[in-house]
């Protein structure tokens, strides 16, 4: 702070943590809360537990701001959002009440059932334990997170025929995926329905085009993908850890290139995972997952569609029973999707966000 000259104003940035998204608002005009000498003796973050929903107030110093506005760097915003997400995860109690059918949310027990099903049917996925300090007591010690490793990526998301849309309408997945100021139960729900209505045919066409595009050695990347359980949103949460052709960890900025632009800009965070120490990963924020899953399940029931994975080529799984090399996936035995089949549909959903990651690899890649 000694490096700065001139007048100092303190701004409050309000981080409103809701069940739907994290909203960042600047409060104007600035409020002179603390004099410079007293800043170091006061906490920089306050949390008011009496608020519902919880609200964080973060003090940010701003110098020489005659227009009484301050602009936070994009990376700062990402870290603020990640910090808010981590705090919300820590503070939210675990729910064991099943609302799978009505909300699209699942309990920890249902997450384990869905993970067992995924591992049994698609053996490129496996359960893993967590770092000692990160063990979550509401999950079995050896089933803290699901992981699949060495998933190749040869093209960046922006080169897969531009923004990925999943329906025939103008508004597709990309506009839905942004956590903005829309009413969470209004326009977004209609857009989710468009996604669920589609058979992901356009996504498959894009994948075929991408496969024909020449890729150089420098384009090749590999990913370890992790599915953890989010207590704050009561849904699975996807973490990505990428590596260069030389095996060096990718920076968050590099990994952003493999997530569709409209999604990465608003609902992707850089954070320490809930299951591992001393590492930073990119996480796909789960604020919309429950709504997507609920609508997808409703569409499965309405159509009586027995094949919940029809038309999806890139899910990071290899079926142990698939001997013909075709994209034949587990069928739903009844018109209603079972809770243990939840993660298969979840991965169908995630595949649209990371179209450049080639999940259709074989066991020989391990």
From Swiss-Prot:
Region feature Handle region, mapped onto this chain: 291-341
Active site: 287
Keywords: Autophagy, Cytoplasm, Protein transport, Transport, Ubl conjugation pathway
Keyword Signal set for record: no
Chain segments carrying region Flexible region: 160-217
Main location: cytoplasm
GO BP: any one term: cytoplasm to vacuole targeting by the Cvt pathway
Pfam families per the UniProt record, alphabetical: Autophagy_act_C
Gene Ontology MF terms in the entry: Atg8-family conjugating enzyme activity; Atg8-family ligase activity
Location(s), subcellular: Cytoplasm
Entry annotated with the keyword Transport: yes
Any one Gene Ontology cellular component term annotated for this protein: phagophore
Subunit structure: Monomer. Interacts with ATG8 through an intermediate thioester bond through the C-terminal Gly of ATG8. Also interacts with the 40 amino acid C-terminal region of the E1-like ATG7 enzyme. Also interacts with the ATG12-ATG5 conjugate.
Domains (record comment): The N-terminal region is involved in phosphatidylethanolamine-binding and is required for ATG8-PE conjugation. The flexible region (FR) is required for ATG7-binding.
Free-text function comment from the UniProt entry: E2 conjugating enzyme required for the cytoplasm to vacuole transport (Cvt) and autophagy. Required for selective autophagic degradation of the nucleus (nucleophagy) as well as for mitophagy which contributes to regulate mitochondrial quantity and quality by eliminating the mitochondria to a basal level to fulfill cellular energy requirements and preventing excess ROS production. Responsible for the E2-like covalent binding of phosphatidylethanolamine to the C-terminal Gly of ATG8.
Protein family per UniProt: Belongs to the ATG3 family.
Protein name listed in UniProt: Autophagy-related protein 3
């Amino acid at each position: 702070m000694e490096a700065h000259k001139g007048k100092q104003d303190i701004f409050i940035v309000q981080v409103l943590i809701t069940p739907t998204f994290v909203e960042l608002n600047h409060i104007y005009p600035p409020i002179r809360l603390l004099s410079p000498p007293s800043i170091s003796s006061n906490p920089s973050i306050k949390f008011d537990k009496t608020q519902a929903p919880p609200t964080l107030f973060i003090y940010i110093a701003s110098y020489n701001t005659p227009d009484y506005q301050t602009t936070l760097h994009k990376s700062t915003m990402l870290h603020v959002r990640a910090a808010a997400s981590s705090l919300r995860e820590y503070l939210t109690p675990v729910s064991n009440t099943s609302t799978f059918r009505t909300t699209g949310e699942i309990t920890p027990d249902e997450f384990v059932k869905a993970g067992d099903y995924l591992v049994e049917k698609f053996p490129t996925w496996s359960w893993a334990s967590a770092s000692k300090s990160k063990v979550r007591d509401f999950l079995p010690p050896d089933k803290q997170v699901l992981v699949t490793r060495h998933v190749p990526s040869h093209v960046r998301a922006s080169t897969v025929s531009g923004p990925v849309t999943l329906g025939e309408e103008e508004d597709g997945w990309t506009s839905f995926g942004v956590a903005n100021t829309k009413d969470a139960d209004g326009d977004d729900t209609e857009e989710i329905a468009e996604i669920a209505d589609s058979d992901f045919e356009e996504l498959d066409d894009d994948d075929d085009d991408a496969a024909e595009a020449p890729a150089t050695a420098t384009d090749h990347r590999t990913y370890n993908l992790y599915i953890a359980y989010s207590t704050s949103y009561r849904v699975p949460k996807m973490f990505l850890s990428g590596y260069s052709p030389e095996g060096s960890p990718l920076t968050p900025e590099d990994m952003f290139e493999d997530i569709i632009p409209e999604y990465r800009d608003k609902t992707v965070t850089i954070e320490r995972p809930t299951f591992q120490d001393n590492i930073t990963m990119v996480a796909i924020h789960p604020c919309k997952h429950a709504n997507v899953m609920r609508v997808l399940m409703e569409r499965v029931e309405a159509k009586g569609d027995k094949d919940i994975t029809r038309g999806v080529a890139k899910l990071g799984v290899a079926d142990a029973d698939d001997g013909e090399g075709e994209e034949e996936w587990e069928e739903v035995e009844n018109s209603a999707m079972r809770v243990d089949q939840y993660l298969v549909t979840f991965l169908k959903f995630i595949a649209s966000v990371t179209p450049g990651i080639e999940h259709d690899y074989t066991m020989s890649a391990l």
